[in-house]
Amino acid sequence: MSRRRQATRRPVQKDAKFNNTLVSRLVNTVMVSGKKSTAQRIVYGAFNRIAEKNPAANPLDILQRAVDNAKPRLEVKARRVGGATYQVPVEVTTDRQFALALRWLVDFADARKGTPMRDALATEIMEAYQGQGNAISKRDEVHKMAQANKAFAHFRW
């Protein structure tokens, strides 16, 4: 692997149906084993469920608010200093905030057994939109860990 320079990030293509990069990133997060059409069917089905539950609201706006609510601002990273490992709180970059929020939404939707994935994803997005649900509790847990380890913030690198 070459060490000359860092690889450039390729921009995410906009979604064909909604013309939105956030939807495209959600589809890519849902995708398993390269089955993109299945992932698109799941995400579009979830949007249909959201539209059925809230006919007045736009599903894209609901998704945007849900992701904004689930985004972590701080997280902890392990840092080894003098034989001891400290959990050092660090700020999360914008790109990683989106990635973590989407991953948490999809993972917790996948963990809801007994319901189709599109319904579980729609429920998880709606709960995050309302400021509750598993993704929000995960964000709060990460923030709580960062707050508890605030004393080690000077080990930041």
PLM feature spans:
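Strongly charged
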Residues: S2-S33, S37, G45-W157
